[in-house]
């Protein structure tokens, strides 16, 4: 990776800064990622967390940053290449040929966090980001770089039967060799994103150019890379750091009606997340939150507060935050 730029104001406004991470070139040309940080009240704090988003996603969850600040943990977030702040005009959104493509920006982000003076680094990943950071943490050279993993509904399984995967994956690989950007004819349903945005059914405001509410094209190369990563999870990753997995207790689908829609995961099968969690490492806690949606920290207020409380208790029990801590802020307080 070439030399990184300096910290600049971020689109989230006062209190947030961003840094562009130059990552060279790939099969589409220039590649960058974006590191965002919440300016800490205590710049000498030794603990920090790095948050990595999911598919069709970017960092906008300021209330999550506020939660960690309340625990005395400096907050950083990474917009991966070809996502959100990092998407360049010549790039195909979300395209990757292997999930290992994301490892350089995670390496660079952790190095910058260490350079900022933080000795203890937590890494948190949501959905696809949860799968990516798990694979990254399992790499031999990375096992000493992370002190704990916090996974928010990690994409450990596609919910696709084995027979279907065995039939589809070879076809995908052939088509990808011919055209890396080959896409499936159907678009990903926009129902989940619309259930979050305040202009539709939700309470959150986010940039719909970076988190689409119109459905997205699923690339065959991306799906093949996801399935390859999930195979590694099933084989066992052997992560040595403690891992917390948070997910809901019930799943639905894009046809699930309101108000049930706001109390279930309509993206992933939470039972499979819970079933596969022990494959991540030797010290894994899976906590299921009743009423949680796919991103548990975007659930209804009482549910997400329970998730925050469970996370704070786990961090304290593992001596990852100070025992004396400020009560984390609720969104909207």
Show which residues each predicted segment covers:
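Serine-hydrolase catalytic core
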Residues: 183-288
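Catalytic active-site module of serine/aspartate enzymes centered on a nucleophile-bearing elbow/loop
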Residues: 283-333
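Alpha/beta-hydrolase-fold enzymes
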Residues: 128, 132-218
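Catalytic nucleophile-loop/oxyanion-hole region of alpha/beta-hydrolase
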Residues: 56, 84-120, 303-307
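Conserved alpha/beta-hydrolase
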Residues: 57-65, 69-90
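Short beta-strand element of the alpha/beta-hydrolase
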Residues: 46-54
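N-terminal cap/lid segment of alpha/beta-hydrolase-fold proteins
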Residues: 1-42
């Amino acid at each position: 990776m070439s030399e990184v730029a300096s910290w600049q104001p971020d689109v989230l406004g006062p209190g947030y800064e961003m840094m562009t991470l130059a990552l060279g070139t790939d099969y589409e040309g220039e590649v960058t990622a974006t590191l965002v940080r919440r300016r800490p009240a205590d710049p000498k704090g030794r603990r920090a967390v790095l948050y990595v988003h999911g598919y069709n996603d970017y960092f906008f969850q300021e209330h999550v940053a506020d939660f960690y600040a309340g625990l005395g943990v400096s907050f950083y977030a990474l917009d991966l290449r070809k996502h959100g702040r990092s998407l360049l005009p010549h790039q195909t959104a979300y395209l990757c040929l292997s999930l290992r493509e994301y490892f350089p920006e995670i390496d660079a982000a952790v190095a910058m966090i260490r350079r900022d003076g933080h000795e203890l680094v937590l890494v948190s990943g949501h959905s696809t980001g949860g799968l990516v950071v798990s694979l990254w943490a399992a790499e031999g050279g990375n096992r000493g770089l992370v002190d704990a993993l916090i996974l928010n509904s990690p994409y450990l399984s596609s919910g696709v039967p084995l027979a279907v995967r065995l039939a589809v994956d070879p076809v995908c690989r052939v088509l990808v060799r011919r055209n890396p950007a080959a896409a499936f004819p159907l678009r990903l349903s926009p129902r989940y994103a619309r259930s979050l945005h305040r202009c539709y059914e939700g309470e959150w405001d986010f940039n719909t150019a970076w988190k689409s509410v119109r459905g997205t094209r699923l690339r065959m190369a991306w799906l093949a890379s996801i399935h390859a990563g999930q195979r590694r999870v099933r084989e066992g990753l052997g992560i040595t750091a403690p891992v917390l997995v948070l997910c809901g207790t019930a799943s639905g689908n894009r046809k699930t009606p309101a108000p049930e829609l706001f109390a279930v995961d309509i993206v992933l099968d939470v039972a499979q997340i819970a079933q596969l969690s022990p494959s991540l490492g030797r010290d894994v806690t899976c906590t299921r939150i009743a009423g949680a949606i796919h991103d548990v920290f975007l659930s209804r207020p009482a549910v997400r507060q329970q998730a925050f409380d469970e996370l704070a208790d786990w961090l304290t029990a593992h001596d990852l935050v100070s025992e004396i801590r400020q009560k984390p802020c609720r969104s909207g307080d």
